[in-house]
Structure formats: C-alpha cells, structure tokens
Amino acid sequence: MTGNVEHEPMRHRFVVRLPEGEGELVYRPTAAGALDLIHTGVDPQLRRRGIGEQLVRAALAYARAHHVRIIATCPFVARWLEKHPEERDLVAER
C-alpha cells in the first residue's frame, strides 16, 4: 500500500503519510534555482513498499512541471537515477 505524496514547500519536502508511519524526501533550493535532493527517509515498517520511489517520482514531476533542475545529493536518489536514465535530463550540471 502506498499513499499520496504531499509537497510541503515551507518545510522543503515531499511526504507520504500512512497510519504505520511516513516517508519523506527533503530538498534544499539552491542559489541557481535547482532543487538539491538531500535526503530520503522511510520509516522501517514502510520500507520495501515503493514509498521511496514514489517520493522521487513526485519530486521529479514537480521539477519538470516547474522547469527546474535537480541535484541528486541523496544516495537513494542518485541510485534511482542510475536505474532510470530517461529522467537524467533533469540533473543540473555541477
């Protein structure tokens, strides 16, 4: 079971809340206008349910819709992008 991803721009995160816990993807806006995706965390009882992927996809959809690039500082996001090269056009040059 997965939940709906909510964007909390004031807290710089995307979050999924379920009765058993929550997952979040935290970002930091950069001076260049990119989103630095810095941390993905999912409560242990929710792991292996695709919550992390759901969060990454939501962040990338947001970036695409708002014409901003991303930086994949978070190791989970970086590994996910390695497996999904079709999304790498969103990655900012460093």
Language-model segment annotations:
Residues 1-34, 38-40:
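N-terminal first-folded block
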Residues 38, 54-60:
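Short, hydrophobic/aliphatic alpha-helical segments
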Residues 43:
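Residue-level recognition of the GNAT/N-acetyltransferase active site
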Residues 46, 50-55:
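Conserved acetyl-CoA pyrophosphate-binding loop and the N-cap/start of the following alpha-helix
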Residues 58-94:
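C-terminal structural segments of small proteins and small subunits
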